Amino acid sequence: NATGQGNISISLVPPSKAVEXHQXQQIFIEAKASKIFNCRMEWEKVERGRRTSLCTHDPAKICSRDHAQSSATWSCSQPFKVVCVYIAFYSTDYR
């Protein structure tokens, strides 16, 4: 995001499974080259709002803070494995 602060979590589940998202502990997993998926976004919603609270630098003042929450649905699949064969043949006496 624009501030450089934020969390994102990604889970791969079957389409038939109901999923609930909750703000929970952060888990960082190193990506492996063998786990490659083709993904596309199917649905996205962004909710923006403004909150007011006491300023941290001067508690006598009120500061406003903009925030945004995004939700998205992605569809992912494993890429197709295609075998490509290229044969070059040259001969002056082909039988």
From Swiss-Prot:
Region annotated IV (linker domain) sits at 22-30
What keywords would UniProt list here? Glycoprotein, Secreted
In this chain, the stretch annotated as V (Cys-rich) covers 31-95
Q: Enumerate the subcellular locations listed in this protein's record, separating them with semicolons.
A: Secreted
Residue positions with a glycan: N1, N7
Top-rank lineage group of the source organism = Eukaryota
Q: Does the keyword Glycoprotein apply?
A: yes
Note one Pfam family from the annotation.
Neurexophilin
Q: Does the keyword Secreted apply?
A: yes
Q: Where is this region: III?
A: 1-21
One GO cellular component, as annotated: extracellular region
User: Which family does the record assign?
Assistant: Belongs to the neurexophilin family.
Biological function: May be signaling molecules that resemble neuropeptides. Ligand for alpha-neurexins.
Protein name per UniProt: Neurexophilin-3
Q: Which organism is it from?
A: Macaca mulatta (Rhesus macaque)
